């Protein structure tokens, strides 16, 4: 009898221990145990890749393909055959995973944000165009803002941060599938040759949808570069490099006279035409303009869904810029400092709201020179590769893993790769990095930026004022002259009628 009681007691102890371990493991997987709202359930209704969007900057054409079940199978088989290659390992953290079929689990939380009342994409593009042409007048416009409670990614939850990082890595994935691409550019008046299929050179976005919760996540592809940034794949290198050098350099990637600049805004030593750079950023064949199209087309496909943004490297910076433009949440990974291009684009910010209170979170670690803004100088890896990564300042909040002290890492460009961030940072830390206000910094402090448009107006006003003063002085002189020498009248004439005597 006593032996049976001991056996039962041992079974109870084992059961309690199992439950304790299970609860601890569940809390650990949730990061800090935050009780955010789940955006996935046991039936697998989470986020799946539903569309791939591509943009051709040469013809200013965007196209989209729906990810069908047939495409999932063929694309996952292609990835499986490439398992173990440098290509796969550079963008996907789990070799052999199925990125086209994977169901992502994200958690959300409520957050009060200030955003524009009119967030219609057409209205926003008109405002940005106007602010670039007339920045002084744009500052006088009183935009209408609203405070709204929205659902944002719970960045305190490790699984949520991990899922967004995997989505960002997913955006690097190429597929051999070339059928059923739809042209989405007809509304922009495109009349040239339509290109369908996989376009290697341009911006790409992977669109993940949760049809139950009506949330859409747009993951924007980062920089592709052979042996430099993160993907190991050579697609989109040319345009990625142009946009990197335009967005994150002080002046068109003018490092020295040996460099070929990406725009003609350089004036002289450490002097740059500010209006020229701003206009270059908004050109229709640049990536920021492409992200505006991407957002517009996704909102047309899912008008009743909330939009979240994510991306790695260049893709993260573009996600942050797009998030500020429309007031939607953005979570980035190892993004270069994007505060300078945000200011150059004159993106709206609620009056009195510090930029660190926006719904933008930048995750990164201090062994990545691009995220830290230290990959510059003639001998840096970025400069040797032809990249002018001169910005360090971020908008929103700053979430940094201290791998230098915690893991003994040294600053190295290889640490920028997305798969290393996922495998050796996010997965190895028990909790996500704490998000806080970004350090105070100033980009390009030693440069002089000339506002030629403002100078021309001031010169014109000065010229008009000088002309008015000269005219006024001339009139006063004439008045004084006529007053000092009043007109004389004739007081005597000869027999012919000619005046011979004058008097006052």
Curated annotation (Swiss-Prot):
GO terms for molecular function: phospholipase activity; triacylglycerol lipase activity. Residues 458-484 are annotated as: Disordered. Its EC number is 3.1.1.3. One of its GO terms (biological process) is multivesicular body membrane disassembly. It is an enzyme of class 3 (hydrolase). It catalyses: a triacylglycerol + H2O = a diacylglycerol + a fatty acid + H(+). GO terms for cellular component: endoplasmic reticulum; multivesicular body membrane; vacuolar lumen; vacuolar membrane. Residues 461-483 have a biased composition (Low complexity). The active site is at residue 313. Belongs to the AB hydrolase superfamily. Lipase family. This is Putative lipase ATG15. It comes from Candida glabrata (strain ATCC 2001 / BCRC 20586 / JCM 3761 / NBRC 0622 / NRRL Y-65 / CBS 138). The lineage of its organism: Eukaryota, Fungi, Dikarya, Ascomycota, Saccharomycotina.
